Amino acid sequence: MIVVAHLLDALFPEGHDIRVDGALIHGSARTGAAESVAVIGTANAAAVDAALALSLVEHLLAVLDGPPRPLVLLVDTSGQALRRHEELIGLNAYLAHVAECVDFARRSGFPSLSLVYGQAVSGGFLSFGMMADRVYALASAQIRVMDLRAMARITKIPHEELVRLAAESPVFAPGAENYARMGAIEAIWSEPSSLLLNAALAELLGHQAVAREDHRREFGQLRGGRLLAARTVAAIGAAR
């Protein structure tokens, strides 16, 4: 398990002013590629509830009140909070609000990249880290939409069959490597590195117009992990 303090020191050796308040990471840092980056994220395998979602949005909107600068989103989440209270108050709308704010930042001149350094599960990942212009992951990261046993209970497909399918298709399989094959992850880092972060930021800042385009389906086709998405979108576009 990555200790957040060690992660921050490895990513931002030029210095940072970042706080970890329970499950919330927020602050600013200096990098070799940008004088100032805003850093927002989750820690301790946080289950994202309505309160945490609003805290993420609060810090995102505070950054947007200032001059444009890159956003670095750090991801360690066990997914959305699975509590009756959260469902009753409409947690899905809170998560949608987080996704909208990250997307609004992207379209407002705040280029973003996310780094999965711990867990990345379900809605906690989809609404935040996966919304960035570029998504990276440490090799040790645990990425999945749903545990195969939970998937078996819901779909009524035997667990053994899902294990077999996961071995054949990255769509069913957890892990950073499988998400990279599907195009969801830009690249996998063996360890947290300021050199890798600076290179990723430099690429992002040098090609901001391209960065705002979503090429994940093309990456999925090139890497052999998602073969139909790009062709389907192209066919729909050609039929207009």
Which residues does each predicted region cover?
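Amphipathic alpha-helical segments at domain termini/boundaries
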Residues: 1-16, 154, 158-240
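STAS-typified acidic loop motif
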Residues: 7, 28-54
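N-terminal short beta-loop-beta anion/metal-coordinating cradle
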Residues: 15-34
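A structural preference for short, pocket-lining loop segments at secondary-structure junctions
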Residues: 36-41, 55-84
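Short strand->helix junction
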Residues: 45-46, 80, 119
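Short, hydrophobic/amphipathic alpha-helical packing segments
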Residues: 53-61, 95, 129
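Conserved catalytic cores of soluble enzyme domains
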Residues: 83-197
